[in-house]
């Protein structure tokens, strides 16, 4: 199981650093590589430029996508997670679009957490 952590904004860094230091298998995805390297490059080299198509190629069944990206990315990432039978977590509220994915998530036996 790999955690695909998307976004390295200020609120993301403490939790992300803790997971990396604790030895979890994490791939850090960020829109700008330099910002991600500045945030966690001292403790991991597993940093990729965020691209939803590349994430799709790397995402496996049972993996976890953590989105610390802006809310407009949450539904596309949740849909990708459903397609790949992986779990999805965000720090956002439950939008009507996210709520609409609930039955599909139950059917796929994956968790969508907001």
What residue spans do the PLM features occupy?
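Gly/Ala-rich phosphate-binding loop of Rossmann-like dinucleotide-binding domains
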Residues: 16, 20-21
């Amino acid at each position: 199981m790999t955690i695909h952590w998307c976004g390295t904004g200020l609120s993301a860094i403490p939790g992300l650093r803790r997971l990396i230091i604790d030895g979890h298998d994490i791939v850090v995805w960020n829109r700008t590589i330099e910002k991600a390297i500045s945030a966690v490059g001292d403790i991991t080299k597993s940093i990729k430029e965020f691209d939803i198509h590349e994430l799709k190629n790397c995402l496996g069944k049972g993996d976890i996508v953590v989105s610390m990206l802006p809310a407009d990315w949450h539904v596309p990432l949740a849909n990708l997670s459903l397609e790949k039978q992986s779990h999805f977590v965000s720090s956002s509220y439950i939008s009507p679009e996210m709520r609409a994915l609930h039955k599909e998530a139950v059917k796929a036996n994956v968790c969508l957490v907001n």
